[in-house]
Amino acid sequence: MLCAIYKSKKKDGMYLYIEKRDDFSVLPDSLREAFGIPVFVMLFNLVGKKTLINTDNREVMEQIKQNGFYLQMPKKDDWLFTIEKSCDL
């Protein structure tokens, strides 16, 4: 199964996986608004030998089949690092 991966301009580390490139009709309006304008990253074969770095290929496939999309949120650790960094000012 091929999927299209997009990154968010609004939130670093937020990625959207959908089955068909540029077909955002499956997304709820609230998600479209929160995600912002999607920036295409790549097409990815979820059943190929390569694995995704921050999420599981099978989980992405299951979510796409169930919901039409998979939303990868930023790591919590990245958020904590940002707070620690701002406190060092």
UniProtKB/Swiss-Prot annotation:
UniProt cross-references to SUPFAM superfamilies, sorted A to Z: YcgL-like
Record domain YcgL: where: 1-85
Lineage top rank: taxon: Bacteria
Cited Gene3D superfamilies: YcgL domain
InterPro entries: YcgL-like_sf, YcgL_dom
Cross-referenced HAMAP family: UPF0745
PANTHER family registered for this protein in UniProt: PROTEIN YCGL (PTHR38109:SF1)
Protein name: YcgL domain-containing protein Asuc_1390
Gene source species: Actinobacillus succinogenes (strain ATCC 55618 / DSM 22257 / CCUG 43843 / 130Z)
Higher taxonomy: Bacteria, Pseudomonadati, Pseudomonadota, Gammaproteobacteria, Pasteurellales
